[in-house]
Amino acid sequence: RYPDRTSSLIMGGAVMKLNLRGQILMRLGVLLKSVLPYLVLYRFFALIIMPKKSHSEARNLFVREAKKLYQKEFKKWFTLASEINPLLSLFRLRDSQIPTLYIMGEEDHMFLPSITKLVQNHIESTLHVIPNCGYVVNVEQPNIFNEVSIKFINDRKSNN
């Protein structure tokens, strides 16, 4: 709506499209959210999104933060998240032409493929993939995440 208010974006572990597996999981979650305790669902989804042993710190953080939500809030969030694909398609189709850096983990099997495709079609977008890293890049590799982010910000400053 107001593109002049944003000079650049940095998106770590961006979600721009739920792949088929993600869509099925979200629909399954919507069906089960009234039957299963919400923390069971959250732990399950955290394990699906971040399956490797090296992702355990990020997975534990994910679950720890979920505990701060009340079940009613979680159900609202879950319903919202399951309906987000149509809205995200607008962002994928329409190039904002705002310089955007996507920082993704090499082991992010759920969201990296769609970001890779998106960056090919958006002129001002770049992708930095962090090796040996999953979905929550700023937790698993904070030093690399910060270095790449600071470089992007400094490059924008020198271009202005």
Predicted regions and their residues:
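Flexible "cap/lid" loop of the alpha/beta hydrolase fold
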Residues: 1, 5-36
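Cofactor-binding loop segments of dinucleotide-utilizing enzymes, especially the Rossmann-like FAD-
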Residues: 14, 105-106, 132
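Conserved alpha/beta-hydrolase catalytic His-Asp/Glu region
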Residues: 20-22, 38-94
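Glycosyltransferase donor-binding loop in the core domain
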Residues: 66, 108, 134-137
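Short, conserved loop/helix-junction motifs that constitute active-site signature segments
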Residues: 92-97, 120-123
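Short beta-strand/loop motif that positions the catalytic acidic residue
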Residues: 96, 102-104
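Conserved alpha/beta-hydrolase "acid-adjacent" motif
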Residues: 109-115
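Catalytic active-site module of serine/aspartate enzymes centered on a nucleophile-bearing elbow/loop
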Residues: 123-160
